[in-house]
């Protein structure tokens, strides 16, 4: 049995959120393959980790906060991580960026200390991640808006392996615009099922 941490990051209400619909459908399929796994869902909008941001005013104490320790320990205690990753203004939600800031701590989750080549050594090697991306534009419209690649890179930096990212793209233009979030997810259901099977 695996422990699976699921991070909700959307800034929208659940009933209109494409990333919530995608995450729910993924979990539905995942449970078919892994019925005994423990699922832990955390809504970063409702947790301090999603609202405590790194600024010049907070930088001196940011990494000493209990919330930082809590989430590093949580990452070390689970086997799998599911990240709902919608795009807002060509980037990740601020809640997800704040989470990544909180758990990216030198000598806790990554290190250069023992590297022979001077590159980073990720210290969270117990985890496999599944990124579930959503964006309004079709894939390739805005090459600078590669939000899922940023999250993949951040996971790799921390030593986390990941399954092939699932991306639901083009939700704000026809033909997907006219559909409900659940109907949009059905347009990529084969990818969702395959990700659930291999995760």
From Swiss-Prot:
Pfam families, per database record: Flavodoxin_2
Keywords: Flavoprotein, FMN, NAD, Oxidoreductase
SUPFAM superfamilies named in the record: Flavoproteins (SSF52218)
EC number(s) from the headed UniProt entry: 1.6.5.-, 1.7.1.17
First-level EC class: oxidoreductase
UniProt-listed NCBIfam families: PRK01355.1
Protein name, UniProt field: FMN-dependent NADH:quinone oxidoreductase
Species this protein is from: Mycoplasma mycoides subsp. mycoides SC (strain CCUG 32753 / NCTC 10114 / PG1)
């Amino acid at each position: 049995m695996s422990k699976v941490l699921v991070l909700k990051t959307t800034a929208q209400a659940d009933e209109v959120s494409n990333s919530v619909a995608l995450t729910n459908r993924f979990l539905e399929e995942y449970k078919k393959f892994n019925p005994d796994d423990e699922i832990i869902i955390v809504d970063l909008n409702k947790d301090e980790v999603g609202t405590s941001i790194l600024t010049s005013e907070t930088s001196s104490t940011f990494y000493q906060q209990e919330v930082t320790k809590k989430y590093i320990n949580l990452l070390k205690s689970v086997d799998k991580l599911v990240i709902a990753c919608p795009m807002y203004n060509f980037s990740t939600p601020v809640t997800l960026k704040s989470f990544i800031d909180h758990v990216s701590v030198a000598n806790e989750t990554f290190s250069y200390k023992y590297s022979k080549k001077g590159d980073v050594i990720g210290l969270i090697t117990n985890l496999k991640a599944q990124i579930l991306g959503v964006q309004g534009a079709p894939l390739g419209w805005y090459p600078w808006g590669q939000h899922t690649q940023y999250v993949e890179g951040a996971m790799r930096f921390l030593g986390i392996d990941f399954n092939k990212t699932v991306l639901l793209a083009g939700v704000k233009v026809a033909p997907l615009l006219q559909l409900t979030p659940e109907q949009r997810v059905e347009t990529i259901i084969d990818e969702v099922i395959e990700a659930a099977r291999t995760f």
